[in-house]
Curated annotation (Swiss-Prot):
<protein>
    <recommendedName>
        <fullName>Uncharacterized protein MJ1337</fullName>
    </recommendedName>
</protein>
<dbReference type="InterPro" id="IPR029056">
    <property type="entry name" value="Ribokinase-like"/>
</dbReference>
Amino acid sequence: MIGAVLKTLEYFDEKDVKVITTGDIGEGDGSLKIYDALKEIDDDLVIIHYIKPKISKIREINFSPKIIADAGGMYAAKAANIGDKFYLFLPDVGELAFLADEKASHPAYVRGFISEIDDNEVPKLIERDYKLKMPKYMVVKGETDYTIREEKIIDKIKEPKIKAMECIGGTGDTLTEIVSSLISVDFKTEEALSLGCKINRKLGEIANVNPNTQITEIINAIPKALENTLK
């Protein structure tokens, strides 16, 4: 995750990155330290990723920057019913179903009639999500990537389709970090969402991935993917 940000910003000759990380074996003490640090943030853009949801703490963070959430960041936002305070969510289809289920406390507990929605029914799920509190922007990661602004689908990215990318851990994280980095270097948000999806897919092609490919190999291909996509 951090590596993907650094590689993306390196392409733009940007080096001003701050990282908040701490040890946590599941008891939540490390996450509490991160929540406390987030109260003092004065940057323009913040990404909240792996963190243990804590309703009282997530409500206390500084929401003046653009707050982008993936994984635990989204779960915490949903639990606290403050998704609309965030700028961007990046769920996969399973997480999208979780966000749409007002009774689910975790993606593992999504009700069957929602969790059985497949990729072809993503637009219906997006519509259901936005009946609850959601951010202005969203990217849904899947066989087709959807970029969304205020419930409206603004782009669908399907190519290149590299099947092996689906079984390599961390490829959803690289998308989050590429998109966030593009926004941070002043790409317009809608353009950054679409470009990020295209670049992330291009990584699989450039790295010639297979199920044994390591995420570091994919991250190292980011500068070339940026060059090929932005030229």
